[in-house]
């Protein structure tokens, strides 16, 4: 069972429908106990970093996510959810994050030929093969964001070219993040979610 975390700042239903489509049993929940009992967790997110982190903390879900990460169960952060996995953000003001992947969230550079927000389809360049990125080099995914993950190169598994080389996907052990929206990226997005399904089943089998 995959639990999609509901903390009033994410597009939970579209992610749930995408998981339904690939046959991955899932549930939307804000209950810490249900989330802790999941085989894997997806942290969605849209909106502003400070408000999202504040809401996670208010519900006690920041601690829940850190506890789940420590068990080795897979976590996938999507869009703002990916950014929350990092150590901090300077969006509006300095805000501490979950600290599950080293790095900081910064605003995309504004240049005449590159609009902010970065919105639309962009091509993935795979930097490191993982179950989520295999055979996806050169494929297109859908982005909507104004901030990006500035993190050490060893944690970046896929990028897209823009005003800078945007980290499209990041990874630290059992923790994964996608800056783009897999649930809005057609068949390629479904392949990424299938990769998360594979990681989840593999982890569950190893822990039994």
UniProtKB/Swiss-Prot annotation:
**What's the superkingdom here?**
Bacteria
Q: Which keywords does this chain's UniProt record carry?
A: Amino-acid biosynthesis, Cytoplasm, Glutamine amidotransferase, Histidine biosynthesis, Hydrolase, Lyase
GO molecular function annotations of the record: glutaminase activity; imidazoleglycerol-phosphate synthase activity; lyase activity
BP term (GO), one: L-histidine biosynthetic process
Question: Which biological pathway?
Answer: Amino-acid biosynthesis; L-histidine biosynthesis; L-histidine from 5-phospho-alpha-D-ribose 1-diphosphate: step 5/9
Give yes or no: UniProt keyword Cytoplasm: yes
User: What coarse category fits the chief subcellular location reported for this protein?
Assistant: cytoplasm
Subcellular location as annotated: Cytoplasm
- Name the InterPro entries for this protein: Class_I_gatase-like, GATASE, Imidazole-glycPsynth_HisH
Q: Where is the Glutamine amidotransferase type-1 domain?
A: 1-206
Known EC number: 4.3.2.10, 3.5.1.2
Q: Which PROSITE patterns match?
A: GATASE_TYPE_1
Listed under GO cellular component are: cytoplasm
Instruction: Tell whether Lyase is among the UniProt keywords.
Output: yes
Q: Name one Pfam family in it.
A: GATase
Which residues constitute the catalytic centre?
A: 79, 181, 183
Listed under catalytic activity are:
5-[(5-phospho-1-deoxy-D-ribulos-1-ylimino)methylamino]-1-(5-phospho-beta-D-ribosyl)imidazole-4-carboxamide + L-glutamine = D-erythro-1-(imidazol-4-yl)glycerol 3-phosphate + 5-amino-1-(5-phospho-beta-D-ribosyl)imidazole-4-carboxamide + L-glutamate + H(+); L-glutamine + H2O = L-glutamate + NH4(+)
Database matches in NCBIfam families: IMP_synth_hisH
This chain's function reads:
IGPS catalyzes the conversion of PRFAR and glutamine to IGP, AICAR and glutamate. The HisH subunit catalyzes the hydrolysis of glutamine to glutamate and ammonia as part of the synthesis of IGP and AICAR. The resulting ammonia molecule is channeled to the active site of HisF.
Q: How does it assemble?
A: Heterodimer of HisH and HisF.
Protein name per UniProt: Imidazole glycerol phosphate synthase subunit HisH
Tell me what gene encodes this: hisH
């Amino acid at each position: 069972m995959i639990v999609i975390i509901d903390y009033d700042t994410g597009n939970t239903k579209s992610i749930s429908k995408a998981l339904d489509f690939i046959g991955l049993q899932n549930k939307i929940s804000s209950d810490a106990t249900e989330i802790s009992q999941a085989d894997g967790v997806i942290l969605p997110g849209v909106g502003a970093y400070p408000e999202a982190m504040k809401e996670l903390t208010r519900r006690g879900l920041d601690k829940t996510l850190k506890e789940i990460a420590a068990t080795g169960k897979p976590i996938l952060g999507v869009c703002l959810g990916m950014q929350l996995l990092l150590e901090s953000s300077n969006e509006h003001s300095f805000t501490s994050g979950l600290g599950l992947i080293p790095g900081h969230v910064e605003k995309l550079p504004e240049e005449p030929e590159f609009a902010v927000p970065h919105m639309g389809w962009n091509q993935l360049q795979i930097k490191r093969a993982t179950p989520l990125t295999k055979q996806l080099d050169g494929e297109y995914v859908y982005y909507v964001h104004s901030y990006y993950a500035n993190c050490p190169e060893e944690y970046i598994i896929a990028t897209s070219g823009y005003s800078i080389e945007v980290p499209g996907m990041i990874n630290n052990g059992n923790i994964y993040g996608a800056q783009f929206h897999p649930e809005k990226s057609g068949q390629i997005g479904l392949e990424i979610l299938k990769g998360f399904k594979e990681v989840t089943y593999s982890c569950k089998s190893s822990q039994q």
